[in-house]
């Protein structure tokens, strides 16, 4: 990576500003999934071990008005982080002001402070989300000229707490998580070991047009599953019953199929039901057609066997989006079969691009078998699309 990283700067005795992604699910004050906190630990520990004084910034959820603040404080995160680090995490509960400034200035080497939810600044004019220049400058003034961005999950956004701070410090550098995310995803797409197979699931073609187009020019094969497969199948003239479809994208699907010249791999059969919820009948189809009154909710056995064939010998696999409604045990066999087919390839570099695919791998017990699971759904999508991430572009060149 051509950007400075946290290892390239002197940290001892410095107030080091760190953007992390602690946007974790919280229910009744309890964190239900702390993966993002765990993912940030290597960078935080390194800064503290080097004698830096860490000042952490993160958003949590969306905050548009005063009433949105309830349940959006980072207080539970400060507590969880303290337990993971085995040391106190100072939490003044503010995003600005004399109390916050005093607490930061009182930090000693190896100590840590967490600023309150950066999106509390969105209540008055969306200052965080719109990258207000004064806010970026103010937050930058709280440190000693070093900013570490370790929040890959927000790297595709230009906010005050990443791009804004970066513009007002001497050195803006990447943390270990951001560095790894870029290395795995960008290298997989730009310089893959071949054969390179991309797998795209999810519900809408419209969400992934740019990704499909970019990957068709880079990958040896692009496997399409999930809800968006039905738009492609309808474009080819197959019956899709009541399955999810984007009729306004049929011409685009035809164009992509022509451009793909055999590279796009679609399901060969389906597991269908007579309703999405409250269904009374589930069955498998004999081929690519889906009968009237039924909707496709997963792929079936012929397709799973085909996944094994298509992935045979693959050296690089990038997967974004499940191929069925994996949250429902009736419709998770396709996603499980796909994961099995990926992880059994010898010497494969296997990367999951965040979001629902990451949840599927974690919930179904496959996480440890993949080379890398991204922490940022939107950011990884934009990298797969070949876009430049603002949070990364704002970092200091080596």
Curated annotation (Swiss-Prot):
Chain's gene name: pgk
Cellular compartment(s): Cytoplasm
Residues that hold substrate according to the record: 21-23, 36, 59-62, 119, 157
UniProt catalytic activity: (2R)-3-phosphoglycerate + ATP = (2R)-3-phospho-glyceroyl phosphate + ADP
A GO CC term attached to the entry: cytosol
Alphabetically ordered keywords of this record: ATP-binding, Cytoplasm, Glycolysis, Kinase, Nucleotide-binding, Transferase
Protein name: Phosphoglycerate kinase
A single BP term in Gene Ontology: glycolytic process
E.C. designation(s): 2.7.2.3
Lineage, broadest ranks: Bacteria, Bacillati, Bacillota, Bacilli, Lactobacillales
């Amino acid at each position: 990576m051509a950007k400075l990283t946290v290892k390239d700067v002197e940290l001892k005795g410095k107030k080091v500003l760190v953007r992390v992604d602690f946007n974790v699910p919280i229910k009744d004050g309890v964190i239900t999934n702390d993966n993002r906190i765990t993912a940030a630990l290597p960078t935080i520990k390194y800064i503290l071990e080097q004698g830096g004084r860490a000042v952490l910034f993160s958003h949590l959820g969306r905050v548009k008005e005063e009433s949105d603040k309830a349940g959006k404080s980072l207080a539970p995160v400060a507590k969880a982080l303290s337990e993971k680090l085995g040391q106190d995490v100072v939490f003044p509960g503010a995003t600005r002001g004399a109390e916050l400034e005093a607490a930061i200035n009182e930090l000693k080497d190896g100590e840590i402070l967490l600023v309150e939810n950066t999106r509390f600044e969105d209540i008055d004019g969306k200052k965080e989300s719109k990258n207000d220049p004064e806010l970026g400058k103010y937050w930058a003034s709280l440190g000693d000229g070093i900013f570490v961005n370790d929040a890959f999950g927000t790297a595709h956004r230009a906010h005050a707490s990443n791009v804004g701070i970066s513009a007002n410090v001497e050195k803006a550098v990447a943390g270990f998580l951001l560095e790894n995310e870029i290395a795995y995803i960008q290298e997989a797409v730009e310089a893959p070991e071949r054969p390179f197979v991309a797998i795209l699931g999810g519900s809408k073609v419209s969400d992934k047009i740019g990704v499909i187009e970019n990957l068709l020019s880079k990958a040896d094969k692009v496997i399409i599953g999930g809800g968006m497969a039905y738009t492609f199948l309808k474009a080819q003239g197959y019956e899709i019953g009541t399955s999810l479809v984007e009729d306004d994208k049929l011409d685009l699907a035809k164009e992509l199929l022509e451009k793909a010249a055999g590279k796009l791999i679609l399901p060969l059969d389906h597991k269908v039901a007579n309703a999405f919820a409250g269904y009374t009948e589930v069955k498998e189809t004999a081929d690519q057609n889906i009968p009237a009154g039924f909707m496709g909710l997963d792929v079936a056995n012929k397709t799973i066997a085909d996944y094994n064939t298509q992935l045979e010998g693959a050296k690089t696999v990038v997967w974004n989006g499940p191929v069925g409604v994996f949250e429902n045990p009736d419709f998770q066999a396709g996603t499980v079969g796909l994961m099995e087919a990926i992880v059994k390839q010898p010497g494969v570099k296997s990367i999951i691009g965040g979001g629902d695919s990451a949840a599927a791998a974690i919930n179904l017990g496959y996480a440890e078998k993949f080379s890398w699971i991204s922490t940022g759904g939107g950011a990884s999508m934009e990298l797969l699309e070949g876009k430049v991430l603002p949070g990364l572009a704002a970092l200091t060149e080596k």
